[in-house]
Amino acid sequence: MRKKIIAGNWKMNLTLAEAKEITKGLLSACDSSSYEIMVFPSALHLESVASIARDSQLIVGAQNAYQSGLTAMTGEISPVQLAELGIQTVLVGHSERRQFLGETSEFDNTKISYFLKHGLRVVYCVGETWAEREKGNTFSVLEDQIGKGLKGITSDLFKNLVIAYEPVWAIGTGKVATPVEAEEAHAFIRKEIGKLFVGADLVAENIQILYGGSVKPDNIKELLAKPNIDGGLVGGASQKLDLFLGLLK
């Protein structure tokens, strides 16, 4: 049975004091929650947040890393440096990095492959824009992102892979896919993963697929009631402790 995940992506938000406060407030919730709880702080806050979360059930992940060991790559973070902080989970493919930094699914594939082969857990984000959805291209976009992003990933590596479906038009807009629309996309993603290689149907059945896009305490239960939705990758509602705790009830 797939365990539900609630993951908070803090992006470039929160002061250090705010990040620490939320982290401390989540520790006791982790002990009693049936969910797997993750937070993805700003790179500058990783060390402090990871220190607070050490020896707890709270998983601290990085919003980005580079697909290499220690090397000359200005402005990037190596998984080796993350490991020193006890961080073994990384986001890949978020729509903001695709849209504003020009990252492609092919580029994401190099990250995913490197990270998984070096023992990291990856949360791979996929999703369509509003223009793509209006043209009826949601499924073709998802097929392309899954096919290119996960190309060559072998079955043994999927145990450390999580998918997050984030329709770009619902991120930070207040819009949200209906539970039926979200379930439809999640079911399609699961089907596409099942077509990646011989025997991938079992991998597809076991992989956790999260929904992201204006997830809040008042809509999360209905979303998680759908059979193919295994949790949420949450932005705004994860940046206030009371709302984050509300997601876990």
Swiss-Prot record:
InterPro entries for the chain: Aldolase_TIM, TIM_sf, TrioseP_Isoase_bac/euk, Triosephosphate_isomerase, Triosephosphate_isomerase_AS
Cellular compartment(s): Cytoplasm
Classification via CDD domains: TIM
EC number: 5.3.1.1
Disulfide bonds, paired cysteine numbers: none
Residues involved in substrate binding: N9, W10, K11, G172, S214, G235, G236
Pathways involved: Carbohydrate biosynthesis; gluconeogenesis; Carbohydrate degradation; glycolysis; D-glyceraldehyde 3-phosphate from glycerone phosphate: step 1/1
Tree of life domain: Bacteria
GO molecular function, one term: triose-phosphate isomerase activity
Annotated PROSITE patterns: TIM_1 (PS00171), TIM_2 (PS51440)
Role of this protein: Involved in the gluconeogenesis. Catalyzes stereospecifically the conversion of dihydroxyacetone phosphate (DHAP) to D-glyceraldehyde-3-phosphate (G3P).
HAMAP family: TIM_B (MF_00147_B)
Oligomer status and interactors: Homodimer.
Name of the molecule in the record: Triosephosphate isomerase
Taxonomic source organism: Leptospira biflexa serovar Patoc (strain Patoc 1 / ATCC 23582 / Paris)
Lineage start: Bacteria, Pseudomonadati, Spirochaetota, Spirochaetia, Leptospirales
